């Protein structure tokens, strides 16, 4: 069970974007893509087949999953725990104890 999932609000805890918040767009093997964070400029060639004009585009690059943490109700970074109730696993915030939606 992943502790960070698509749609979660996270805060960056290390790196050049430290302190910035965003929503997780996708989760991969040890990496997450967060909306509007870790932007890089990529040079793109014009391609009439794809409809691109070319030039310099800003692209969101993946971050290590260890460099982000979920945001609690107080706006602070929180670790995530997993507890088992019956046969279901439930994620919860370690700082407040609040349960997260599936």
From Swiss-Prot:
A Pfam family hit: KOW
Keywords carried by this UniProt record: Ribonucleoprotein, Ribosomal protein, RNA-binding, rRNA-binding
Keyword RNA-binding: yes
Entry GO CC: ribonucleoprotein complex; ribosome
Domain of life (superkingdom): Bacteria
Keyword Ribosomal protein (UniProt): yes
Subunit: Part of the 50S ribosomal subunit.
Function: One of two assembly initiator proteins, it binds directly to the 5'-end of the 23S rRNA, where it nucleates assembly of the 50S subunit. One of the proteins that surrounds the polypeptide exit tunnel on the outside of the subunit.
Protein family per UniProt: Belongs to the universal ribosomal protein uL24 family.
Name of this chain's protein: Large ribosomal subunit protein uL24
Organism: Paraburkholderia xenovorans (strain LB400)
Gene name linked to the record: rplX
């Amino acid at each position: 069970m992943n502790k960070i999932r698509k749609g979660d609000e996270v805060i960056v805890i290390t790196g050049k974007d430290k302190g910035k918040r965003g929503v997780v767009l996708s989760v991969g093997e040890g990496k997450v893509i967060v909306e509007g964070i870790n932007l890089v400029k990529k040079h793109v060639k014009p391609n009439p087949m794809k409809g691109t004009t070319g030039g310099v585009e800003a692209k969101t690059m993946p971050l290590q999953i260890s460099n982000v943490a979920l945001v609690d109700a107080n706006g602070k970074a929180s670790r995530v725990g997993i507890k088992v109730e019956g046969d279901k696993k439930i994620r919860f915030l370690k700082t407040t104890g609040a349960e997260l939606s599936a």
